[in-house]
């Protein structure tokens, strides 16, 4: 089950395409992968940006899906 949320990009490594989002509701950080972004936002993603995303339960903990810049 996914849940729509907002948060701030805590870290993002353009080489690996991985990072973390800190959710606005104070829950634990959510894993971010470049494949969860639309193509336009993937070029602009950087630390400190506010994003909207769906939180899903991945094999390695909470992950972000359908990530958009807000």
UniProtKB/Swiss-Prot annotation:
Indicate the segments forming the CSD domain, all copies: 7-67
Q: What is the protein's name according to its record?
A: Cold shock-like protein CspF
**UniProt cross-references to InterPro entries, sorted A to Z:** Cold_shock_CspA, CSD, CSD_CS, CSP_DNA-bd, NA-bd_OB-fold
Matching PROSITE patterns, A to Z? CSD_1 (PS00352), CSD_2 (PS51857)
Q: What is its main location?
A: cytoplasm
Q: Where are the transmembrane segments?
A: none
Does Transcription regulation count among this protein's keywords?
A: yes
What gene makes this protein?
A: cspF
Keyword Cell inner membrane attributed? no
Protein's organism: Escherichia coli (strain K12)
Record keywords = Activator, Cytoplasm, DNA-binding, Transcription, Transcription regulation
Gene Ontology CC terms, in alphabetical order: cytosol
| GO terms, molecular function | DNA binding; nucleic acid binding
| GO BP: any one term | regulation of gene expression
Q: Where in the cell is it found?
A: Cytoplasm
Q: Name one Pfam family in it.
A: CSD
